[in-house]
């Protein structure tokens, strides 16, 4: 059976200074025989005084006591202000009833608490046994009235019996509360002092982030960059640091972050420039090496002691890579025209940067002054398959001999056009020689022209077709028909192919002969009679 008992609250005693404030609690009591028989649990509670005995100060924070220290979150309070407030109002705190407890007093206080609890439990059991007289339980209403009277008289009896225990308990609880308050005050002050630097630093960082100035982008003007470069060169590109550069520049609007960022970009750009300069220097060095090697070869081929100003200049000047395979106009104008070139001949194509036939290698880099007796070698242009074999090149290059004169008749085109009434004619000096029209495709396939070094192959030449003549010009139409008629050589070649391979179909443009034409041709040849089988086969 549970019975209501009163317990003393240490906090209430500390606030009021004297006893008298109680807290309602439930203390287990030994069951009586009547209760065991009836199996009824009785709670003796005084409804009129219940609210007065309950202490609501500890109900806000469950599972904690008010003197346990810092339970609520710590606020930004300066410990010095808190101590000054406590020192200014000493009357608010209750005066301590006893002095500070010694080392052995906590154990004695704990023993006194246990004795008080045991005495209270024994007194409650004795009172319950004395009240029970073995009579049957009263009616419900009467039982409720007796319970009220008993609950009202019970606190007075407990106060009378446990007077000495209450004094000891109040003294012990007062001392414990004062010591606990001192301990809780000191850890709170320590917590304030420990957390103040971190909280102040966090508040300072928050203030800087919220109220601080935003990063301003620096406009690096040419003058500002010039001063930056001067400072970097003064310190050295490898030893320059942002702080020293900022000191040397002496500009207040710049920060160390701006200098560090610009220094990184400057070093990267300078690295790329140095790489490009190194590459250009390597190319220049290679050109100088090639020029020196060419000059040494020219001196060795020329005989040694002969060194003129042109050779010295060529040895010093760097070699320039040619961009096209043809000489510039001013170089072509310096070469005089030949006095008497052979017909159907022209000078060979000169590639810029390469020596020409019949000229010493020393003149390739810097040609000597023109001499009236020196004539550039001339080679035939067309047709190539009729030209005699040229002399060996090493002898001509090494000794500078001129090739033997060639009969111009060997280069004449042995053709006669009856319609145009022209034949082989001599070419007057100074007449430009151009390549003739392309031969038919069949001729090109059967007689391919061998490639000539320095000359563009024939298939690369694209003849420009003549413009179409007007409809009323009969002479122009006749001329066009004559040009479109195949030549005799091409017809003979096609007929020869047909006679060699009669089983193949006739090429385009050839038709089988008719019977009348064959018979007339046979009569012309002196064959008057033709057997019928041959005529049938021919038909």
Swiss-Prot record:
Principal subcellular localization: nucleus
Feature: DNA-binding region: 242-267
Tissue expression as described in the entry: Expressed in leaves.
Annotated spans, Disordered: 86-218
Gene Ontology annotations of biological process type: positive regulation of DNA-templated transcription
Biased composition (Low complexity): 99-111, 121-130
Job description of the protein: Probable transcriptional activator that promotes chloroplast development. Acts as an activator of nuclear photosynthetic genes involved in chlorophyll biosynthesis, light harvesting, and electron transport.
This protein's name: Probable transcription factor GLK2
């Amino acid at each position: 059976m549970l019975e209501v008992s009163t317990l003393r609250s240490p906090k209430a005693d500390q606030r009021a200074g004297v006893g008298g404030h109680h807290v309602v609690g439930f203390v287990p009591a030994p069951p009586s025989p009547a209760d065991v028989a009836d199996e009824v649990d009785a709670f003796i509670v005084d409804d009129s005084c219940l609210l007065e005995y309950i202490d609501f100060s500890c109900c806000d924070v469950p599972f904690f006591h008010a003197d346990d220290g810092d339970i609520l979150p710590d606020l930004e309070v300066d410990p010095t202000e808190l101590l000054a407030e406590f020192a200014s109002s000493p009357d608010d705190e209750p005066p301590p009833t006893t002095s500070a407890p010694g080392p052995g007093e906590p154990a004695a206080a704990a023993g006194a608490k246990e004795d008080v609890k045991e005495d209270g439990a024994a007194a409650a059991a004795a009172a319950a046994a004395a009240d029970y007289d073995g009579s049957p339980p009263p009616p419900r209403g009467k039982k409720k009235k007796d319970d009220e009277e008993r609950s009202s008289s019970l606190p007075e009896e407990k106060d009378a019996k446990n007077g000495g225990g209450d004094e000891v308990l109040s003294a012990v609880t007062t001392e414990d509360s004062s010591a606990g308050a001192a301990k809780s005050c000191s850890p709170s002050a320590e917590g304030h002092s420990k957390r103040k630097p971190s909280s102040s630093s966090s508040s300072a960082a928050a203030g800087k982030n919220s109220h601080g100035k935003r990063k301003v982008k620096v406009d690096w003007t040419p003058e500002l960059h010039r001063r930056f470069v001067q400072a970097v060169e003064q310190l050295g590109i490898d030893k320059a640091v942002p702080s020293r550069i900022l000191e040397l520049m002496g500009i207040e609007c710049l920060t160390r972050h701006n200098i560090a960022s610009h220094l990184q970009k400057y070093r990267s750009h300078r690295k790329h420039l140095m790489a490009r300069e190194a590459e250009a220097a390597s190319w220049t060095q290679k050109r100088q090496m090639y020029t020196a090697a060419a000059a040494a070869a020219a001196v060795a081929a020329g005989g040694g002691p002969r060194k003129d100003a042109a050779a010295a200049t060529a040895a010093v000047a760097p070699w320039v890579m040619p961009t096209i395979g043809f000489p510039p106009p001013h170089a072509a104008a310096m070469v005089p025209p030949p006095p008497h070139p052979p017909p159907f001949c022209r000078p060979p194509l000169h590639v810029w940067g390469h020596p020409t036939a019949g000229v010493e290698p020393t003149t390739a880099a810097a040609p000597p002054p023109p001499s009236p007796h020196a004539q550039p070698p001339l080679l035939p242009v067309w047709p190539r398959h009729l030209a005699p074999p040229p002399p060996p090149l090493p002898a001509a290059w090494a000794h500078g001999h001129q090739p033997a004169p060639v009969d111009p008749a060997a280069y004449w085109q042995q053709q006669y056009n009856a319609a145009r009434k022209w034949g082989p004619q001599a070419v007057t000096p100074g007449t430009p020689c151009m390549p003739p029209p392309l031969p038919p495709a069949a001729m090109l396939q059967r007689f391919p022209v061998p490639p000539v070094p320095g000359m563009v192959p024939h298939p690369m030449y694209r003849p420009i077709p003549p413009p179409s003549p007007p409809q009323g010009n009969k002479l122009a139409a006749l001329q066009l028909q004559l040009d479109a008629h195949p030549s005799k050589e091409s017809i003979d070649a096609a007929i020869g192919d047909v006679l060699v391979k009669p089983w193949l179909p006739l090429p385009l443009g050839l038709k089988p002969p008719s019977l009348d034409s064959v018979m007339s041709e046979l009569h012309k040849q002196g064959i008057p009679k033709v057997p019928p089988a041959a005529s049938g086969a021919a038909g």
